[in-house]
């Protein structure tokens, strides 16, 4: 939700792009006229060898700021030296986003990038951003740099593809995951503004999803059919969705989300002492679980769910509980390509001693317990292969979370019944 790649990887009709590594690689799976990729630091260089043997006059090449700082500038230098016609789209999202949001290896900002590529002979250079007014008047840009709003990206690209030689677009928009983390630490501006959808007006056309490519725009089933709603807990306030031609969107400024009441509590959410005491009594009344015997063999737990919802945290809590109880444990988190929004599996193995744990991964048919935080991930091929008939017990969350397929297909239906039947 709110990822800058949602907009930055688009290309105008009649053009194509070459993929970069990391998050840029995922554009290959999307309908973004993007093909081929290279190792880190060679983004776009395939065009150097291809250009003389095709009638195609121009391509775009995607590259991230982390890759650019590491070795990507060398690829741009090679392209400029070969005098091919191409435009590098350098995404400055202010983080090494895919691997955990680390900072760059050294100091880097859009102005520095502009001066470096200009020194290599790249021109023109256009900065495209969601906040054109954020740059101080004395920003040390390379000569001739212009700044445009991201709403003009299509027009900027149409202009660039007519330019001879190597040109560059520096797309400046902070990584959505990093925005979220920094806002929690009060280290990034958090506008008092939210977009909501009036379901009575919404016709369920899905144009908001087309414009934003955002997973926070979710289906809402009503008596009048499927509508749209914005999941405010996952929204990162990108506001690309409001650019659609739709009267159902309402922008609320200055308001705050209403916090749900706690069970037995009052409007302040604090609850009364009596209610808290009652909750503690109910918790004590719960039957104690039957703990598995770890004397003979390890106990395998597989936690499945969606990245960013606490799957890894659940695995860590189980491991720490085993450690506190004096047992051995291991945890292996399989978070895939992206840390948020994708399938995540946490392999937890518990044993009487370290000598009994021969592998950190739960083997084929070796799961004694599956904690399915998301039913679709629990029914995936990888997760199913860890389950064994007569051995595995599964506890699965029935709440349905839309997938990326809904963004492309407004009539997409969640395969919940099929997933449960498979399990």
Sequence positions of predicted segments:
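Active-site cofactor/cluster-binding pocket
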Residues: 108-111, 115-116, 121-124, 251, ...
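Thiamine diphosphate
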Residues: 1-167, 260, 267, 284, ...
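Glycine/aspartate-rich loop-and-adjacent alpha/beta segment that forms the canonical ThDP
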Residues: 142-149, 155-213
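Iron-sulfur cluster-binding cysteine motifs and their immediate structural context
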Residues: 173-174, 179-185, 203-260
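Extended, hydrophobic alpha-helical segments in both membrane/secreted and soluble proteins
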Residues: 39, 43-50, 56-82, 86-89, ...
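Short acidic, glycine/serine/threonine-rich loops at helix termini
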Residues: 11-13, 21, 27-33, 71-75, ...
């Amino acid at each position: 939700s709110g990822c800058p790649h949602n907009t930055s990887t688009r290309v105008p009709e009649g053009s194509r792009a070459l993929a970069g590594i990391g998050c840029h690689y995922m554009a290959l799976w999307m309908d973004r006229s993007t093909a081929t990729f290279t190792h880190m630091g060679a983004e776009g260089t395939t065009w150097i060898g291809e250009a003389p043997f095709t009638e195609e006059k121009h391509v775009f090449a995607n590259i991230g700021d982390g890759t650019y700082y590491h070795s990507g500038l060398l690829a741009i230098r090679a392209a400029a030296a070969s005098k091919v016609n191409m435009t590098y789209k350098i995404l400055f999202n202010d983080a090494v986003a895919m691997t955990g949001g680390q900072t760059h290896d050294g100091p880097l900002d859009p102005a520095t990038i502009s001066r470096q590529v200009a020194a290599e002979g790249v021109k023109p250079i256009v900065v495209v951003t969601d906040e054109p007014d954020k740059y101080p008047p004395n920003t040390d840009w390379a000569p001739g740099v212009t700044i445009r709003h991201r709403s003009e990206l299509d027009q900027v690209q149409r202009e660039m593809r007519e330019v001879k030689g190597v040109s560059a677009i520096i797309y400046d928009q902070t990584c959505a995951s990093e925005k979220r983390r920094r806002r929690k630490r009060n280290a990034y501006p958090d506008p008092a503004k939210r977009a909501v959808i009036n379901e009575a007006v919404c016709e369920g056309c899905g144009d908001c999803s087309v414009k934003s490519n955002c997973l926070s725009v979710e289906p809402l089933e009503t008596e009048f059919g499927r509508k749209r709603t914005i999941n405010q807990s996952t929204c990162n306030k990108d506001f690309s969705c409001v650019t659609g031609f739709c009267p159902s969107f309402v922008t609320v400024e200055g308001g705050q989300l209403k916090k749900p009441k706690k069970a037995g509590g009052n409007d302040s959410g604090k609850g009364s002492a009596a209610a808290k005491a009652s909750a503690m009594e109910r918790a004590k009344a719960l039957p104690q679980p039957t703990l598995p015997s770890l004397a003979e063999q390890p106990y395998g737990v597989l936690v499945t769910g969606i990245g960013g919802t606490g799957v890894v945290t659940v695995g860590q809590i189980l491991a720490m509980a085993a450690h506190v109880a004096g047992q051995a444990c291991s945890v292996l988190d399989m978070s895939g390509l992206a840390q948020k929004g994708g399938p995540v599996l946490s392999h937890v193995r518990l044993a009487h001693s370290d000598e009994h744990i021969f592998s950190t991964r739960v083997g084929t048919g070796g799961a004694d317990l599956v904690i399915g935080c998301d039913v679709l991930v629990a029914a995936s091929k990888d997760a199913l292969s860890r389950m064994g008939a007569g051995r595995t017990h599964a506890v699965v969350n029935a709440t349905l979370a839309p997938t990326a397929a809904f963004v492309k297909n407004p009539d997409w239906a969640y395969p919940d019944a099929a997933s449960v039947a498979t399990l």
